[in-house]
């Protein structure tokens, strides 16, 4: 899957990357868990700003980065997409990477009034 395909159904994207790349590993917000060919989601946390870890994840093989800061404010040499809210797009990005598995499920509900 290409980065542009991963982002296609995601709302809240402020700036799309100018380049595309092949994504061969999952999305992660944990810099230590990013796999070569994967996507790093950089967001500002309570104690650590994930944007500061972008050079490290790129050195470890990240193919692309999604972050909350404007592209001009981050040190990123791979395709970068800016989003409004990193936490809000984490689930949809993971679902997109895995081909939206919940769309293939049939949900059946059973309800009752006693008990």
Residue locations for each model-derived region?
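Walker A (P-loop) phosphate-binding motif
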Residues: 95-115
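N-terminal leader/targeting and accessory segments in enzymes
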Residues: 1-92, 96
